[in-house]
């Protein structure tokens, strides 16, 4: 079975393809010229993964898997959260890291608890399957 991965991140695609080696399914990429991806307007990682997976599955008429993930910092009330990838105006890893460190200035080491949250959602023909994990 082929499952289209609802991302244009080639690194992420390679990771999923590696995980599926030797299995009875394979992950395939979306065409790079797909420009109509919907905005991630959800208020949770799960909602954003659903938006992407549903759109891609219905567009290509095949099973799709989407993920949404990010960093949640307790001292910042869960920020950057769903905005992790676009936390800074530059929307780059370096820019996001710099903004996070600026916002953490003055926060004591013992109050710097955080977690990385990843939500995976599969969608096909109106049915969903969902999994979520965190790394503290």
Language-model regions: role of each:
Residues 2-4, 11-136:
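Anionic-ligand binding patches
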């Amino acid at each position: 079975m082929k499952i289209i991965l609802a991302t244009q991140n080639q690194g992420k695609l390679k990771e999923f393809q590696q995980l599926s080696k030797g299995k009875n399914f394979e992950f395939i990429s979306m065409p790079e010229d797909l420009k109509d991806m919907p905005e991630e307007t959800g208020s949770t990682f799960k909602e954003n993964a659903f938006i992407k997976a549903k759109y891609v599955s219905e567009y290509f008429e095949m099973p799709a898997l989407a993920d949404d993930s990010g960093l949640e910092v307790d001292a910042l009330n869960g920020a950057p959260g769903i905005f992790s990838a676009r936390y800074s105006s530059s929307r780059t890893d370096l820019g996001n890291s710099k903004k996070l460190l600026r916002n953490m200035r003055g926060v004591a080491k013992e109050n710097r608890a955080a977690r990385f949250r990843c939500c995976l959602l599969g969608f096909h023909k109106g049915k969903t399957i969902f999994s979520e994990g965190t790394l503290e």
